[in-house]
Amino acid sequence: PVFFYKTGKIRHTRSPISRNFSYLCSVVAFIPTIMMYMEEVKRIPYGVSNFVDVIEQNQYYVDKTMYLPLLEDQPSNLFLIRPPRFGKSIFLSMMSAYYDIARKDDFERLFGNLWIGSHPTRLQGTFQIMSFDFSRVGGSREQLEVNFQIYCTGELNIFMNKYHDFYSDHIRAQFEAAPTFEAKLQVILGEAHLRNYPLYLIVDEYDNFTNVVLNEHGENVYHTLTHADGFYRNAFKKFKGTFDRILMMGVSPITLDDLTSGFNIGWNISTKQQFNTMLGFSETDVRQMFQYYKDCEQLKGDIDEMITEIKPWYDNYCFSEESLNRDPKMFNCDMVLYYLRQKIDLGYSPKQMIDPNTRTDYSKMKRLLNLDHLDGDRKGVIRRIAEEGQIVADLALSFPAKDLVNPELFTSLLFYYGMLTIIGTRGDRLILGIPNNNVRKQYYDYMLEQYQNKERISLNDLKNLYDNMAFDGDWRPAMEKIAYDYKENSSVRSLIEGE
């Protein structure tokens, strides 16, 4: 028996060649819809950073594989800096799966439906991949080096188990006997060089460990790790000249600058136009994703209205001056997925448009801003940005931690953390602006905290007054409160001068 779809009904026929030939023609237009219903709807990959899991567990993936050939055309050792929650980890995970010689035969299964599946490069499946995620390292001041050794040694053990067949019993015995991470690494590097094994080093959150140290333990401890014979600096010196290709990603340029004298072969592509849209979602990406879930009858509502709703909150990131008039602005990945998940699960937009999980990112940034306490100049920078929404500045590609207190570099730090983005030019300088409401609220919250530290104000009482004015028309108490506070905090001269 054959079943044909027509006008929402299923029709049964024993002879599709005779009476139902016309249905055979009409059904062709419905094949994509039928196939979509036959397949399991893809899950939303919120918070998932493992590319193989996304593919194998039937989760939605926004294809970024077209950037792999562009990266291959760059120098062999690269750095890229992007704000938190912009898809760095899953991109690096995708790269690992693509170049891993241990997954060479998985290419069609993992990448067959992606852009690179039809455009494979000669480097696909040719590397042994060594990966580190330094966000997993932390601890007390006394335990930092020990924890670093434990984590890195564990990753090397995973590497040796994965590529077991490439190394002889003798080499594996040497590896096991090596007492430290550096010694184990040297065993691998020596044998790989001797045997001409191509090695690819991929480091996620290369700056996270040191940023945490800077925040929690201060500049002196940070300086000890990243200068002279500091163990973190020494690790990067081991990487120098020993890997065929290297890609490192992070959220700030601070560690990059402090380590470059020991690791001076990295090429910073953070502001290169070719990679402006490599991380994050374009509006086209978002529309295609929303359309997919609408076609699956998971997402209700008008897509244009949804885009209009989320753009002021999650969009408008630009990381390259050359991209201003040629590339689309970029959405924050996790924010879009947060909205989509809420919209599908609840049937309406989230009451709070800001993902609560981003509060941890804000807390990290706030601690970094408060190093040595904000001086007057830097407070003025934040106040000006909060009030005017933009500032004209030169963008520094990197700078050492000791220069964090320099107000001229402060705007660059805000840019790399995603608190400012490129919105225009003025002469040879950039106009950096607040990208969206999500970030704008973080500025206001920060300013409010600073004011609260000076004089505590009951915000709940203020909210009650404004709510009574807005919802009940009871405006007198709110106006009296404003007039009283103005009188208490203003001088006669302020009135004379018109302030």
Residue ranges of model-derived segments:
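Conserved lysine of the Walker
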Residues: 88
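Amphipathic alpha-helical segments of the small helical/lid subdomains adjacent to P-loop NTPase cores
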Residues: 255-262, 269-341, 381
